[in-house]
Each structure stands twice: as C-alpha cells, then as structure tokens.
C-alpha cells in the first residue's frame, strides 16, 4: 500500500471564540495558511485539535469545513481513537470518511494495556477500518508506551496500518522501529525535540 503521509504534516488546532464556540472563520484561515506555507498533509481532530473537548456534531462540522477548504489539495488524516475499542470501531463505522485519506488512532489511554492488549486493540481497529491507519504513540498523554517490537509486529501483520506518529521521546525506540519496520511503513515524528 502506497503511503501518502510523508513530508511536513501539520496537526491542526481547533480555534475557539471567547464564548468557547468554534471559530470556523479562523479555522479556514489556519488551513489556508498551512497550505500556503507548504504543508504536505494535514491532521484534523487529533490531540492538538482538542478532540476530547468536542461534541460529535462539532467534530463533524470541523471535518466538513476543513474538507471544503482543502478541496483535495493535500491528503487529510483524521483522528479516530480512544481507550474503548468497541466505541472506536463504532465511530469508524458511523463516520463519513469521504474526502479523508487516512485515520490516526491513539494508543488506549488511562487503562494502561499490556503490549498484547495494544496489539489486540489495533488488530480490531485495523480489521474494521475503512481507510489506511496511522498509529499514534504518545505515552506522555496516554500513560502507556507502545514498544518498538509491538509497533513492528502490528505493522507487519496489518498492511492497512501504514505508519506511526511516534511521540515517545526516545530516539532509541524510533531507531528500532525504523530498522525493523516493513517496507513502506512511515515513521512520523510526533515529538518536536526529536525532529529538530
């Protein structure tokens, strides 16, 4: 499977007005700014986008607005994740994925699953996903680190898992993934300190 999530990917924030409603005009400006300044793909509704604080209707409207501005000019990666495997699958099944090129899905948080638990979570999601998946390992937010061996096992077993946004902060872990990943599996930096 060809991977389109390469180069400069920008995780969009969700701009709010002072009354805490979403500022859709600011969102449109933000998307155009990123496109005008060379973003190769955009990621919507991830942790930077304040997804846990948004309602389903707000998420749907953000998706609609971003798609209407992008108009296919760059690939869109949309977040769909959580610590409840069945709920993630249900959200995948009930969401409109038209105009979206891939799904970003975080390691389950709070419950601190084992490495086998992480594997089983992503196995179920991969089997249900309508689009290519990018895993998201951010232990500083989830409380659990998906080890390199687990990442590579998942990547090898499920060809629709095309990459990982790796934010463990461990250069050693990133190096191990790069050395052992299947061909075409992308490692996207989710850690600014390791990117520089």
Sequence positions of predicted segments:
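Catalytic alpha/beta core domains of metabolic enzymes, predominantly
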Residues: 127-128, 141-196
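Active-site beta->alpha loop and helix N-cap motifs at the rims of alpha/beta catalytic domains
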Residues: 2-145, 153
């Amino acid at each position: 499977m060809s991977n389109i999530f390469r180069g400069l990917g920008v995780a969009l924030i969700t701009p709010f007005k002072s009354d805490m409603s979403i500022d859709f005009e600011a969102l449109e400006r933000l998307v155009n700014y990123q496109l005008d300044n060379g973003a190769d793909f955009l990621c919507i509704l991830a942790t930077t986008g304040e997804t846990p604080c948004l309602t389903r209707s707000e998420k749907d409207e953000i998706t609609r607005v971003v798609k209407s501005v992008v108009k296919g000019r760059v690939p869109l990666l949309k977040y769909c994740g959580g610590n409840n495997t069945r709920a993630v699958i249900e959200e995948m099944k009930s969401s409109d994925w038209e105009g979206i090129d891939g799904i970003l899905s975080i390691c389950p948080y709070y419950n601190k699953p084992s490495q086998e638990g992480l594997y089983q979570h992503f196995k179920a999601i991969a089997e249900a996903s309508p689009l290519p998946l990018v895993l998201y390992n951010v232990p500083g937010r989830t409380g659990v680190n998906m080890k390199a061996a687990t990442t590579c096992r998942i990547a090898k077993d499920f060809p629709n898992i095309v990459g990982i946004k790796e934010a463990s902060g461990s250069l050693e872990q990133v190096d191990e993934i790069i050395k052992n990943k299947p061909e075409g599996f992308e490692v996207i930096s989710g850690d600014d300190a390791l990117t520089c």
